[in-house]
UniProtKB/Swiss-Prot annotation:
It is found in: Cytoplasm; Secreted; Cell surface. The keyword Metal-binding applies. The active site is at E209, K343. Keywords: Cytoplasm, Glycolysis, Lyase, Magnesium, Metal-binding, Secreted. Catalyzes the reversible conversion of 2-phosphoglycerate (2-PG) into phosphoenolpyruvate (PEP). It is essential for the degradation of carbohydrates via glycolysis. (2R)-2-phosphoglycerate binds at Q167, K343, R372, S373, K394. One of its GO terms (biological process) is glycolytic process. GO terms for cellular component: cell surface; extracellular region; phosphopyruvate hydratase complex. It catalyses: (2R)-2-phosphoglycerate = phosphoenolpyruvate + H2O. This is Enolase.
Length: 433
């Protein structure tokens, strides 16, 4: 019933109007799984390769026909007759067939789409929801939790066309008792933020991840207007709502000069000075999590930042670790950061993603499940967050259906699981338990 009889790939469109790979895996029992690969804007240099055609006459070079050739050709042929329930074997076949360190032959976008579609097909064959199947693959059958959302309500950096250097300013509805209540609180702050921005004459157009993208006087002003919105929504900052930031600092790091250049503010920092700048912000605002607070190659700087802030703040590695167990192990061994961002297209398969989550948890690091700035209606990360009991999720703001699709799937899962999937709020954040 769970043998693969057909694998199909197609080119679909993501939330930025760019092509991406969607795959279907068909099983002999008539079960079908379908999944799409997301795409990042601020990407780590050590991520698995997203294969694009480079043909400027199609989609400005961003077509994925080469990746589809891999899905519909060698991958489909290699997987015929294989048992979809053996996810590790399915993923390993594709990895071995590709034969490169960074999946550059077939593309991580090709391998991941098939990997996730396979998991969905296997879940269907087993007659269980995807999150339950993921929990079994993870070796934690029946262990679930609802993740605390990090909601990106002001977008800057590579996610917006504005003067804000820091890429994401997020709220966490820690005062909520359930995921559904957290979503409501986030929506209320989001709508009040629109009012606050309008009252100041600021633009309320949104960026790639559905957050507002106004020009602001400083990065600190982003936190100030969010604080106003939280109060206007009737919530207490630091009690009901905490704050988080994704600096994506590699995007404003000058490797030659070894400087961090906040062009929007006209300020330049050394590595330790930028960590001190962030530390100062944490004394003025209830910031409990900082992601990619330095360049991905600035390991000495991260050691300093972790030492200075790591006992009270969650220090998340995204570009730093790129969901890669080899790089994460180096971080763990050297006391770098205390949390990893999980993006399965950075590594390119479900099995490798689960391995990164397990390694992080075993080392006492937290794992934050994340979307990419280029998304589709595919909501697999919601099931991944619940099925691994990861505890935290980043999936954008309260607008754009590519973001809201994940929140809606979480609401459905919470309704189905009830007390079996507790919402632990701030306890999930490193340094806050």
């Amino acid at each position: 019933m769970s043998k693969i009889v057909k694998v199909i790939g197609r080119e679909i469109i993501d939330s930025r109007g760019n092509p991406t790979v969607e795959a279907e895996v068909h099983l002999e029992g008539g079960f079908v799984g379908m999944a799409a690969a997301p795409s990042g804007a601020s990407t780590g240099s050590r991520e698995a390769l997203e294969l694009r055609d480079g043909d400027k006459s199609r989609f400005l070079g961003k077509g994925v026909l080469k990746a589809l050739e891999a899905v519909n050709g060698p991958i489909a042929q290699a997987l015929l007759g294989k048992d979809a329930k053996d996810q590790a074997a399915i993923d390993q076949i594709m990895i071995d067939l590709d034969g490169t360190e960074n999946k550059s032959k077939f593309g991580a976008n090709a391998i991941l789409a098939v990997s996730l579609a396979n998991a969905k097909a296997a879940a269907a064959a087993k007659g269980m929801p995807l999150y339950a199947h993921i929990a079994e693959l993870n070796g934690t059958a029946g262990v679930y939790s609802m993740p605390l959302p990090m909601m990106n309500i002001i977008n800057g950096g590579e996610h917006a066309d504005n003067n804000v250097d820091i890429q994401e300013f997020m709220i966490q509805p820690v005062g909520a008792k359930t995921l559904k209540e957290a979503v409501r609180m986030g929506a209320e702050v989001f709508h009040n933020l629109a009012k606050v921005l309008k009252s100041k004459g600021y633009n309320t157009a949104v960026g790639d991840e559905g957050g507002f993208a106004p020009n602001l006087k400083s990065n600190a002003e982003a936190l100030e207007v969010i604080a106003e919105a939280v109060a206007a929504a009737g919530y207490v900052l630091g009690k009901d709502i905490t704050l988080a930031m994704d600096c994506a600092a590699s995007e404003f790091y000058d490797a030659e000069k070894k400087e961090y250049n906040l062009k929007g503010e006209g300020r330049i920092f050394t590595s330790n000075e930028f960590s001190d700048y962030l530390a100062d912000l944490t004394t003025k605002f209830p910031i409990v999590s900082i992601e990619d607070g330095l360049d991905e190659s600035d390991w000495d700087g991260f050691a300093y930042q972790t030492k200075e802030l790591g006992k009270k703040i969650q220090i998340v590695g995204d570009d730093l670790f790129v969901t890669n167990t080899k790089i994460l192990k180096r971080g763990i061994d050297n006391g770098i950061a205390n949390s990893i961002l999980i993006k399965f297209n950075q590594i390119g398969s479900l099995t490798e993603t689960l391995a990164a989550i397990k390694m992080a948890k075993d080392a006492g690091y937290t794992a934050v499940i994340s979307h990419r700035s280029g998304e589709t209606e595919d909501a697999t990360i919601a099931d991944l967050a619940v099925g691994t009991a990861a505890g935290q999720i980043k999936t954008g703001s309260m607008s754009r259906s590519d973001r809201v699709a994940k929140y809606n799937q979480l609401i459905r899962i919470e309704e189905a699981l009830g007390a079996k999937a507790p919402f632990n709020g701030l306890k999930e954040v490193k340094g806050q338990a």
